């Protein structure tokens, strides 16, 4: 499952792209997507999680959707990343039972990356207490 700005380099990631085994779910977002629009679109991710019932959750934690990031033109705040992480963990808890790994992927404004990563980790820690 991927939420990302589209169209954007390298040109892949449209809704129509499903992968060789029909197991790719892209949620493309236009440049300028606001936090509310992003969070509403993210409900599709949460619904797919409920449907799939994963036993393991791997966060590919990219923070280039932050409003201050120079790469993408999405408009999330550090607090929005906390909300996304928390909601994902809440939805997946019955299936994953705490089997969660997070890998840092992107974020190119160092201050925004630090703040967003911290809020993501805050949600992970709270989830595991």
Model-predicted regions and their roles:
Residues 92-100:
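A short helix->loop->beta-strand "cap" motif at the edges of active sites that frequently abuts
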Residues 66-69, 99, 109-113:
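Short active-site-adjacent structural elements
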Residues 1-87, 93-94, 121-122:
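Conserved alpha-helical scaffold segments that buttress catalytic/binding sites
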Residues 77-78, 110-127:
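Short, electropositive alpha-helical surface patch
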Residues 56, 101-102:
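Beta-strand segments within the central parallel beta-sheet cores of soluble alpha/beta enzyme folds
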């Amino acid at each position: 499952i991927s939420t990302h700005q589209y169209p954007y380099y390298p040109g892949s990631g449209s809704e129509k792209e499903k992968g060789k085994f029909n197991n790719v779910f892209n949620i493309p977002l236009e440049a300028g997507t606001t936090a509310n629009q992003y969070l509403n679109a993210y409900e599709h991710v949460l619904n797919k999680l409920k449907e799939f019932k994963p036993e393991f959750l791997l966060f590919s934690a990219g923070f280039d959707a932050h409003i201050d990031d120079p790469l993408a033109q999405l408009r999330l705040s550090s607090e929005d990343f906390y909300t996304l992480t928390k909601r994902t963990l809440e939805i997946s808890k019955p299936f994953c039972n705490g089997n969660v790994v997070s890998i840092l992927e992107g974020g190119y404004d160092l201050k925004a990356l630090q703040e967003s990563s911290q809020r993501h980790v805050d949600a992970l820690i709270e989830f595991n207490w």
